Amino acid sequence: MAKKFRVESDTLGEVKIPENSLWGPQTQRSINNFKIGQPGSMPTEIIHSFAILKKSCAISNNELMNLEKKKMKLIINVCDEILQNKHNKEFPLVIWQTGSGTQTNMNINEVISNRANILSGKSLIDSKYIKACLLYTSPSPRDIS
């Protein structure tokens, strides 16, 4: 049985992603480019740490009036799902990445964004709705070291 894909595009061009995956083009490029190590070897504790960080940032940015309450609640709901291990298969990256952890950060952003879209009744790839909100939740490497 052939695997089905969806095609997403961004500033780097088009990329084929497994049809029902919650990740997006940045994660898929990392999968394609870092064929070293065991797939999905990113420790759950790191994924959970990012979920806690993004949940906290969503709450803070709502309090600062930078993020509307509806979007904050969507981000919180998805982060809680991640913390309950409901989406472990959506974090396929290996631990071998560039030093800043950008790939893992983008993987989390894409999963939160796409899952939030589904929860709000939008299409899987209509990620502009939530993606802009996640800009407020992206740490620089100095913030997590």
List PLM regions with ranges.
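Generic N-terminal targeting/processing segments that precede catalytic cores or assembly contacts
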Residues: A2-V94, N107-E110
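Active-site catalytic microenvironments for nucleophilic, acid-base chemistry
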Residues: E63, R115, L119, S140
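Mid-sequence acidic-hydrophobic segments that form the walls
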Residues: E81-N85, N114-K122
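A generic, well-ordered mixed alpha/beta core segment in the N-terminal half of proteins
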Residues: N105-N117
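Helix-loop-helix junctions within predominantly alpha-helical proteins
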Residues: N107, S120, I125-I130
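Single conserved hydrophobic/aromatic residue that forms the stacking wall/gate
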Residues: Y136-S145
